[in-house]
């Protein structure tokens, strides 16, 4: 699973880079990591490691390591405690092969996920998801990004997700459901991604619906934060 894990980390770093760019924060990639030199937007890390064994000193030199700093430790092999960091959460990278279209119950895909195409639509999506100004209209103009929404019969937004394409992989993030049951959202994601190979990460109870949708785990990750 090491190749899938590295590919998932790279795709996630590309998504973080897209979000930061929309906020005027250009990121930098090299073989070790992706990073931004200034504080990233809320919920997003200041660095994402892209291989095992990245030296902590070199990684932290690329970011503002003061209070509020965060690092996505993609291979769960860093120890940032000596630098004042604590583990915020652990999670699992997930992967679903291309064209693996396991049938989902009809009730779960009766209302497919549809792309959000307008700034007003994105604002409405963000109001339900949470995050508000985090999701800026520039995301809709990027051909690599698709913001997905699921609507009830009365037009109410009931859930959604974000896809970001990079090479042969499509990343899945920001999966949510208003009623707390994301199973129908995960069930609709493979079709919305046109059968592409999918990667992402989830933790705790959020992992189970992804596994039911045909994903498998590809290794652990950790997110470190400095108080």
Where are these regions (language model features)?
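N-terminal charged segments
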Residues: 1-66, 74, 125-144
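A short, internal acetyl-CoA/4′-phosphopantetheine-binding micro-motif in the GNAT/acyltransferase core
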Residues: 49-54, 174-182
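Acyl-donor-binding surface of acyltransferase catalytic domains
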Residues: 50-120, 188-189, 197-227
């Amino acid at each position: 699973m090491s190749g899938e894990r590295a590919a998932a980390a790279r795709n996630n770093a590309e998504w973080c880079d897209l979000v930061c760019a929309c906020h005027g924060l250009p990121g930098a990639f090299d073989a070790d990591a992706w990073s931004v030199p200034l504080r990233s937007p809320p919920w997003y890390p200041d660095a994402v490691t892209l291989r095992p064994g990245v030296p902590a000193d070199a990684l932290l030199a690329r970011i503002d390591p003061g209070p509020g700093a965060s690092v996505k430790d993609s291979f769960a092999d860093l120890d940032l405690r000596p630098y004042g960091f604590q583990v915020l959460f652990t999670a699992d990278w997930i992967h679903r092969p291309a064209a693996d279209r396991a049938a989902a119950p009809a009730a779960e895909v009766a209302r497919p996920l549809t792309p959000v195409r307008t700034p007003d639509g994105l604002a409405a999506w963000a109001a339900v998801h949470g995050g508000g100004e985090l999701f800026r209209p520039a995301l809709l103009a990027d051909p690599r990004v698709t913001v997905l929404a699921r609507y009830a019969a009365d037009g109410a937004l009931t859930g959604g997700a974000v896809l970001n394409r990079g090479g042969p992989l499509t990343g899945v993030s920001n999966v949510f459901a208003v009623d707390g049951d994301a199973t129908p959202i995960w069930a609709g994601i493979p079709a919305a991604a046109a059968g592409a190979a999918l990667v992402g990460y989830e933790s705790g109870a959020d992992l189970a619906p992804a596994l039911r949708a045909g994903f498998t785990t590809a290794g652990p990750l950790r997110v470190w934060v400095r108080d």
